[in-house]
């Protein structure tokens, strides 16, 4: 069963700098609600969703069969701090993370590793957005290095 997007998540998607042809990495995608909303808004958009929980990834895949078959979406089970960009994947224009513990400031070493990995998955002009702003805030990745 498809989940309806919440008002909060809708506001977050609205705040993203979306454009035709953009490639997006969603960290902590859960059941894929935001990813589906994004790919159904614009043509040529691609979202790779990752989540540490297999249950969320299974639900996302089950609810997104058409979008996956059309090459608009993919989902991978992975912790962001251990994520390796698959060889077939190109770099991303933006990444966003909502309620992701590795990026909430409570675990500095995990957060440092996660930011290094995200930085490697983004194009040089890539941008990272996390919750905590109005509704998002951008994280500067310029000085992030491994």
Language-model segments: which ranges?
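A short glycine-rich, Lys/Arg-flanked "PGG" loop and its adjoining helix->strand segment in the class I
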Residues: 111-124
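Conserved SAM/SAH-binding beta-strand->alpha-helix loop
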Residues: 53
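A short acidic, Gly/Pro-enriched loop at the edge of an enzyme's catalytic core
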Residues: 85-95
